[in-house]
Amino acid sequence: MARKTPLNRIRNIGIAAHIDAGKTTTSERILFYTGVSHKIGEVHDGAATMDWMEQEKERGITITSAATTCFWKDHQINLIDTPGHVDFTIEVERSMRVLDGAVSVFCSVGGVQPQSETVWRQANKYGVPRIVFVNKMDRIGANFYNVENQIKLRLKANPVPINIPIGAEDTFIGVIDLVQMKAIVWNNETMGSKYDVEEIPSDLLEKAKQYREKLVEAVAEQDEALMEKYLGGEELSVEEIKKGIKTGCLNMSLVPMLCGSSFKNKGVQTLLDAVIDYLPAPTEVVDIKGIDPKTEEEVFVKSSDDGEFAGLAFKIMTDPFVGQLTFVRVYRGKLESGSYVYNSTKDKKERVGRLLKMHSNKREDIKEVYAGEICAFVGLKDTLTGDTLCDEKNAVVLERMEFPEPVIHIAVEPKTKADQEKMGVALGKLAEEDPSFRVMTQEETGQTLIGGMGELHLEIIVDRLKREFKVEAEIGQPQVAFRETIRSSVSKEHKYAKQSGGRGQYGHVFIKLEPKEPGSGYEFVNEISGGVIPKEYIPAVDKGIQEAMQNGVLAGYPVVDFKVTLYDGSYHDVDSSEMAFKIAGSMAFKEASRAANPVLLEPMMKVEVEVPEEYMGDVIGDLNRRRGQINSMDDRLGLKIVNAFVPLVEMFGYSTDLRSATQGRGTYSMEFDHYGEVPSNIAKEIVEKRKG
C-alpha cells in the first residue's frame, strides 16, 4: 500500500487555548467542514467528538489529547486536541513535542489569559510556529483589536492580522481577507458551509487599507527582494504576500492572526486555508535532534520516507476494547503492522500487533504507517511516554521530554479488601499514561500516596479509578510536597569503622556541602587525588548521599539544590567496602546538613484572580492572610486582575472561599511556579507536626 498523501501535504497541528476560548468547538467545526462528522457535537450539551472521556463530558473541559485525521483541499491534517486546564500542562507539553504547528485560539472577550501564556511559553520552548484564531466574535464585548494588543504586550509576540472582522457581537457576519482584499460573508442557512465573496463594505475600506499596509510591510521584511519592491512603491502579488507570511510564520518572526466564531460557524474555512497555506509540513521543520546510543553523539533525524524507521511515543491510553494504545509520531521511514520495533530508550524489542488511525473515538486499521504520520500502536508492552521506537540497526534516541515533579499528594485507601489489588494495578496503569502523576507508599504509615500537579488533576485520577477500573477509593486530606535545602557552606568529615571480630568495615570521607541556585538540583563533584579513596568506592559515596537526601534532617522531606564535593578521606586494604563508604557518605551528609543552616521550602503557586472591582479589597485581604505576595494588579474588560504568588498549602478550598466572597463572580487559575522558603514560625509548626 503506497502512501496516500505526499509528505509535503501533511500538517500535524494542535489546537491550544485557555479553558473557555472555544477550542473543542473549533476542533469540532474543523471535523465538520472537512466532512468527518455529520452532526456537530456541541460542548454545551456534552457531546463533542474530541472530548471522549466521561469526565470531560461532565466538566466540559478537554483532558486527553485525542489525535484525529481529516482532509482539506488535498491536504491531510492530523489534529491533536490539547487540554487547556493548568493541571494538564504536561499533556500540552507532550503534544507540543510532536506537533509541527499550532493554532492558538483566544476568546475575543477574555483575550490573553494566564493559561494562554503557559501554552505560548511551551510552544516557544519547542519552537512551534503558530497562527492565532480569535474566536467568539459573536459574543457581547468581542474586540479583535484588543486581543491583538494583548498578544503584543503579554506574549511579546508580533501578531499580523491576515483578516479582520466585519461587525462584532450580534452584527458579526464575516471577515475581510487582507491578502485578496475581499469581504467574505457567511450564509447562516447552510450552517456556515457556504459563503459569498463580496467587495469590501465602504465603511470598512479605510481600516482594511490600513491593516493591509501593516501586513504588506511585515511581509516585505521577510525578504530583501520584496523589501526593494515595497520601498520602490510596487504592489506585491498575492503569491508573494502568501510566501512572505509563510516565511515569517515558520521563522516565528510574525504570527498570522484571523478571527471568527466557531459556535456560529463563521471563519472556520478561512482558518483551515491558513493552516495549509502557512503552517509547516513535516519537511519544513527543523530536523529533530537525537543521540546515537552507541557513540552518545548528536545526530539529526530528517523527516522522509527514505531511511530506517524512527518515531516517538508521546502518549499512552488504555482502551476498553484494544487494551493499551501507544500514540506515536513517525519522523522517518515506514513501518508495517505485525513487524518488530526496537525501543532504544529501554534497549528492548517489541512487536507491533496492529496500527490504528484514530478519529477522535472511532478507529481504522491500517497496514502501514509513513513518516510524518501520527498513529496508535497496539501490542507494545514496555514502551512509555517519551520513548523512542526505531530500527535496531540504525538506532537513535530522540530527545527526552522533561516531566515536572508533583506538588501535591493525597492518600488513597481502597474501600474493600477486593479493591486493594485492583487499585494497585489501576494506579500503575494511570501512572504509565501520565508521567506527571506519581504513586508511592508512605514508609511510616504504609499508606498509598498519589501525587500530581493540582487538586483537579488528582480528582480526575480518583474519578477514573471509579469509572474505568471500578475501584472505590476513599481519599485523605491533600498534602503538600515540601522540600528542604541548605543556606550555608559546611565541610564535614565522617569515619565509619567497625572492627570487632571477623571482617571489619571501614570508610572515611571529607565532604564540603554548598547551597546552589533554586531549581538547579543536586551535583556531586569528585576531587579525590592520589588515590586516597580508590576509584571504585567513589560512586558508593555519591549513592549514600543520594539515599540520605531523600529524608532531610529538619522534617524528613527531600533535600534539593546543593552541591557536594568529596575532597579527602582514607581507606583500609582489608576492611573497606562499597557499603562502608556508602554509610560514611550518608552520615557525613546528615551531619553537614544539620550544620549548614537547613530551611524548609514549599511550592509557591502563581495565582491569577479575576474579580469585579467591588470585591477587590476583600480578595486582596484574603490573599494576604494566605501569605500571598501580590505581584501586580491590572484591568481587563471592566474586571480587576490580581497576580500573586501564594503558598500551595494555603490554597486548599480556595475556590469555595472565592465563590462565597464574590457571590460567584470571581474566577481564578493557579499553576506551580517555584519553591520558596517557609517563614520560620510556620516551618516550626510543620516540623513539630511531622515529628508528632
Curated annotation (Swiss-Prot):
SMART domains noted in UniProt: EFG_C, EFG_IV
UniProt xrefs under SUPFAM superfamilies: EF-G C-terminal domain-like (SSF54980), P-loop containing nucleoside triphosphate hydrolases (SSF52540), Ribosomal protein S5 domain 2-like (SSF54211), Translation proteins (SSF50447)
Q: What is its main location?
A: cytoplasm
Highest taxon above the source species: Bacteria
Domain named tr-type G: residues: 8-283
Which amino acid positions bind GTP, per UniProt? 17-24, 81-85, 135-138
Record key words, sorted: Cytoplasm, Elongation factor, GTP-binding, Nucleotide-binding, Protein biosynthesis
Give its localization: Cytoplasm
PROSITE patterns per the UniProt record, alphabetical: G_TR_1, G_TR_2
Q: Which InterPro entries match?
A: EFG_II (IPR041095), EFG_III (IPR009022), EFG_III/V (IPR035647), EFG_IV (IPR047872), EFG_V (IPR035649), EFG_V-like (IPR000640), EFTu-like_2 (IPR004161), G_TR_CS (IPR031157)
Q: Name one GO molecular function term.
A: translation elongation factor activity
* Biological process, per Gene Ontology: ribosome disassembly
The UniProt entry's GO CC annotations, sorted and at most eight, read: cytoplasm
Name the job this protein performs.
Catalyzes the GTP-dependent ribosomal translocation step during translation elongation. During this step, the ribosome changes from the pre-translocational (PRE) to the post-translocational (POST) state as the newly formed A-site-bound peptidyl-tRNA and P-site-bound deacylated tRNA move to the P and E sites, respectively. Catalyzes the coordinated movement of the two tRNA molecules, the mRNA and conformational changes in the ribosome.
Q: Which NCBIfam families match?
A: EF-G (TIGR00484), PRK12740.1-3 (NF009379), PRK12740.1-5 (NF009381), small_GTP (TIGR00231)
Protein family according to the UniProt entry: Belongs to the TRAFAC class translation factor GTPase superfamily. Classic translation factor GTPase family. EF-G/EF-2 subfamily.
> HAMAP family given for it?
EF_G_EF_2_B
Provide the protein name: Elongation factor G
Per the record, the gene is fusA
